[in-house]
Regions:
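Amphipathic, Lys/Arg-enriched alpha-helical "gate/interface" segment within cytosolic domains
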Residues: 2-128
Length: 128
């Protein structure tokens, strides 16, 4: 009998220099509450240590298939908690609902928020 492995999770890259903090999140599969229990404390710690620095966020949702119910709630809480933390937020996706979500989210965020279909364009915008 074959074993089925469910691929899901969140990849994180955190880069920092003297003036800027850059966080990149890659979402894969259907996210769970446990995924958020792992990654949220990492982001919280990075933001706390970088207080006063310009902070940008890149979120790649191209391989995201959705959230379990509790994970969707975790995502909402994360967004509300950190709505003032980022100067720029670039979201990479390919679905219309993702683009519409970014448009709605932009009204809640302090910084600039923009949707992209291509990673290169998102990075270019963040680096301006």
């Amino acid at each position: 009998m074959a074993t089925i492995i469910k691929e899901h999770g969140i990849g994180i890259a955190i880069k920092r220099n003297k003036k800027k903090l850059f966080i990149e999140i890659t979402m894969l599969g259907k996210l769970t509450h446990e995924d958020y229990q792992i990654f949220v404390p990492m982001i919280d710690k990075a933001l706390k240590k970088a207080k006063g620095l310009e902070t940008d966020l890149l979120v790649d949702m191209k391989k995201l298939k959705g959230w379990e119910f509790l994970a969707a709630w975790d995502d909402f809480k994360f967004g509300v908690k950190h709505r003032k933390a980022f100067d720029k937020v670039a979201i990479i996706g390919s679905k219309k609902w993702e683009e519409q979500s970014v448009a709605m989210m932009s009204h809640l965020m302090k910084g600039k928020t923009k949707f992209f279909k291509e990673r290169e364009k998102a990075l270019s915008w963040l680096l301006k």
